[in-house]
Structure formats: structure tokens, C-alpha cells
Amino acid sequence: MEISIELRELQPFLNERGQLKNWPAKKKRKVLALWYLAGQLEMRKVYSEAEINTLLDEWTVFHDPATLRRELFNHFLLNLTADGRQYWRAEEIPLLEAFLTKYL
């Protein structure tokens, strides 16, 4: 699989298993990390808070699911019910270039 030039910037933050080793400090890399994590969520699957936390913990080494959930939601990559009990991936995730343009 060929990695886009933009996504290569995230490479130093990934371990050999593809997990995020730490949360990037720079905004562009944070946005790349969010886009990457959103891509790990299944389409049309509804997750409980515990399930989404477990999944985010599986894709990160630093284990901060609350921050990641909030950031994914704030960037319209994750939806949740009003009571915060159920989460699901946004129906359409924009192409990486469009996503970067929107948030940078």
C-alpha cells in the first residue's frame, strides 16, 4: 500500500504495529492522526463508550481515549448520541487532502 506524502509525516508517530506512540504537538500532525484513527473505525457500526475506548487504546500506545473521542467528535469524524452512550464513525470521511485543507 502506498502512503501519501501527507500521511508520511505521521510515520514517526507510529510503531511497527501501526499504533500511535504519542500525541503529536503540531496541529497538522494531530489532524493527520485523527484522520488515521477514524479510518480504523468500522462503517455503520455502533460502539458503546467502553468499546470505542478499547478500540482507541488498541490503536494508541499513550492510551487517552477521552481526548481522542473528543477530538474525533470535534472534527466531525465521530458521532455520538445525546446521552453519550453510543458512538459511530461519520458516514463519509473526506479525502485526506480535503480534510487537511478544512482544518489547517
PLM feature segments, named:
Residues F73-G84:
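A short, conserved structural fragment
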Residues R85-A90:
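Minor-groove-contacting beta-hairpin "wing" of winged helix-turn-helix DNA-binding domains
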Residues L95-L104:
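Short, amphipathic alpha-helical interaction segments positioned at domain boundaries
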Residues L41-K45, V61-F62:
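Short helix-capping/hinge SLiMs at alpha-helix to coil transitions
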Residues W35-A38, N53-D57:
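Amphipathic alpha-helical segments within well-ordered protein domains
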Residues L7-M43:
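Short alpha-helical segments that sit at the start of domains
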Residues M43-L56:
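Short acidic, hydrophobic short linear motifs in intrinsically disordered regions
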Residues W59-E71:
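Short amphipathic alpha-helical interaction segments
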